[in-house]
Amino acid sequence: MSGRRGKIINPRTRGAVRNVGFRNLISDPFAISSILIGLISWVITLGGCISVQVNEDFPRFTWWGIAFQFLIILMLIGFYIYDLVDYYRNFLTASIGVAFVYSTNSANYLIYGSGNQKAAASAGVVLLSMVNLIWIFYYGGDNASPINRWVDSFSLNGIRPSPFEAAKIKAYRRSSKQTQFRGSSVKLTHSTNNLHSASENLGLDNGFYNNPHTSNYVSSTALTEFENTGPPYPSASDLPTNNNAPLRSPQLGNNTIGDTYITATTNNNTNTTMGDTMGLYADLADESFPYRVKALYSYEADSADAYEMSFEQGEILMVSDIEGRWWKAKKESGETGIIPSNYVTIIDNDTEA
């Protein structure tokens, strides 16, 4: 895939094996620019502090702050190369917070001093403090936050997945499944009552239902047997001599079908039996795209991938399943394809687009 803004090209977004390499760092403009500024600020601070120590006493604790800041920069480079930033966001936020305290404390000592050496050192620690504050704001926020999404939209690796958003989607999916299950149970109960009424009208024995008025469910075995209760074609000895007379079905065990006729259009089942049975399963499969999502960003499908689908920012799509990082979606025009999950957000059915 080409490297357009906001385009997902890193295999990690498809759940593939983690991509390790220096490219992870240089393809992220925020990471490479902030780390370079941090390194330049660190070099200025180190040079200024060395020159200050030559001429006068220098706080020893400041040296530890400078060393700690260098460790933070090295860890950031390593985490980006091995694509581990999302796994250590909390650690990075806490560590950079400590480095921010060190740098601001050193700035408080150096900025009010006199001399060119202290001026250079104070400029370095002030720049480090600013970089640390930006890092705290970025790594302390979730990937789904507006600022993080905007920053990550410039990255060639695409927008990073959000653990918070993934947990929210799973909770929403779980509640939606429970709602659909309750709705299916009501439909199943209604269809079961219809099947029972049909069996009474046909003179069937109530062997499948112990108490149809109090039982809300019917076993799959009972449904299977009921679907197959249509009589087989009668033998020649069962055929009436009058060609105009209707064909009456033979007895099935102890069940006698009194007024059910075999016709060429019933496919060995009566119209009543087939209609009720097919209606039962048709209700359960009405919605193949039950979730509504709204596009947060525009997305251009890769021409080399026939399964991807393009969409515009703010467009409303229907989604069949919300598991994984690529979802099958459907447009209002009927076009279907897969879309990246971190480019859309789930909306309620009663929410205005």
Swiss-Prot record:
SMART domains: SH3. Keywords: Cell membrane, Membrane, SH3 domain, Stress response, Transmembrane, Transmembrane helix. The chain crosses the membrane at residues 30-50, 61-81, 91-111, 119-139. Gene3D superfamilies: SH3 Domains. Residues 51-60, 112-118 are extracellular. Residues 288-349 form the SH3 domain. It is a multi-pass membrane protein. It is found in: Cell membrane. Residues 1-29, 82-90, 140-353 are cytoplasmic. The keyword Cell wall biogenesis/degradation does not apply. Pfam families: SH3_1. Plasma membrane osmosensor that activates the high osmolarity glycerol (HOG) MAPK signaling pathway in response to high osmolarity. Forms homooligomers. Belongs to the SHO1 family. This is High osmolarity signaling protein SHO1. It comes from Candida glabrata (strain ATCC 2001 / BCRC 20586 / JCM 3761 / NBRC 0622 / NRRL Y-65 / CBS 138).
